[in-house]
């Protein structure tokens, strides 16, 4: 019986080692890297100027349902979305960025000029040419 317990203990010890091996860290695509750089260097006063370095389609669309904002194309995005960003002096801290297929997701800590802080998530859908086509700010 002691031998059986020893063998079972030995078997359990080695079979309970980590089954998940560390995956090598995947490098971000050029578009995801551009978004990451934009988020990490974000200044509300230069928001659209910095954002314009990220590749987008001509008629890319953004919606921020919690604050009632929606815009299509660079001119509307600059006026509506970045108008809000400038008005609120919105600060963004990138917590994490994840890329999966044609989606890039940013997890953010946001702070307004009044000191209000909240968590946010932005999901970017990228087309087959690596250009941002849709953005959901949640």
Model-derived regions: residue spans:
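Sec-dependent N-terminal signal peptides
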Residues: 4-13
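Short, low-complexity N-terminal intrinsically disordered segments enriched in polar/charged residues
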Residues: 16-46, 50
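A beta-strand edge to alpha-helix "cap/lid" segment located at domain peripheries
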Residues: 17-30, 62, 75-138
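Stable alpha-helical elements in mature extracytoplasmic
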Residues: 34-37, 73, 77
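Hydrophobic alpha-helical core bundles mediating ligand binding, dimerization, or RNAP-core interactions
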Residues: 35-38, 42-45, 55-56, 81, ...
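Conserved catalytic core of Hanks-type protein kinase domains
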Residues: 54-55, 126
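A short gly/proline-enriched turn/hairpin at secondary-structure junctions
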Residues: 59-72
